[in-house]
Amino acid sequence: IAGCHHQSVKQVVALAMHAQSIGYDFIIILTPYVAARDDETVFQFYEYICSKIDIGVILFNVPQNCHPINANLAKRLSKLDNICGYKQADGSPASTHAIIDSVGDDIVVSVADEAPWLTSMTQLGLQWLVNYNPHLYQSKGWLPLKDYTDAALNGDLTEATRIAKSIQPLRELHAKWIMGYWNSGRMPIAEMKYWQELIGMHGGETRPPVIPMTEEKKRELKSDLIKTGLFEIV
C-alpha cells in the first residue's frame, strides 16, 4: 500500500500512477486538510482521483485533522469503483460501528490501532490491521502480532489472548512515547526512529522541521524498553 497523500488532486494522481507503475496493488489517500471542509468537497476530491487512475484506493479517516469521512459519506464513496478499503483513525467505537454498518459489506474496514485488534477480529469481523508502527512490537525471530493473529484465525482464542496480553508493556510505552506526543500535537517521528534502532531496525536521522531526541530522552526510552524484558536492545 503506497501513501499518496497531497493537497493537490493532480499530485495525488501522479503519485498513484507512479505507485502502480512500480508494482503497488493499492494506495491510501488522506482527506485534504486545507480546502476540503464538507462532505461534497471530499466526495469530489476522491471522485476526481478515481476517474483518473486504475488502482485500488483506501480511504483514510483522521477526523482530528481533516473533515471526517462519516458513515453517509463513506457509503457514497464506496460506490466508486476504485474504493476498496477504509482506515479508521477515529477512536470512537460508535463511529467505527456506524462505518461497519454502512460499508462493512462493500469494502474492508480497519481500525488503525493495534490495541483492539484481537477484539476487532473476533467480535467485529474485521479482516486486516492497517497501522503505521506495529513493527515496534517485534524483532527478528519474535513476531507476537503475527502469532496472536494466526492463533485467533485458527480458533485458538486462549493462546491468542495469552500472546496479546504479553505485549501490554509495549502498548504502555507506545502510549507514552508515541501517542502521548501525537495527541499533544507533535509528530513523534524521532521517537519512532530511535525505538526502531534499539530493536535492530535502522531508523535513520530525522529531517527538519522534526526535532531530534535529546540524549537524555534517548536514555529514558532505552531504559523503558529494557525494563519490559521483551527485547534484546541493540
Regions found by a protein language model. Give the residues of each.
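Helix-coil boundary/capping segments in enzymes
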Residues: 1-16, 27, 106-113, 173-174, ...
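Active-site beta->alpha loop and helix N-cap motifs at the rims of alpha/beta catalytic domains
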Residues: 1-66, 211, 231
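Electropositive phosphate-/nucleotide-binding environments in soluble metabolic enzymes
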Residues: 9, 13, 138-142, 154-161, ...
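Glycine-centered loop/turn motif at secondary-structure junctions
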Residues: 23, 81, 124-125, 200, ...
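Catalytic alpha/beta core domains of metabolic enzymes, predominantly
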Residues: 48-51, 63-176
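Conserved short secondary-structure transition element at the edge of the structured enzyme core
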Residues: 168-208
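Long, low-complexity C-terminal extensions of enzymes
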Residues: 208-234
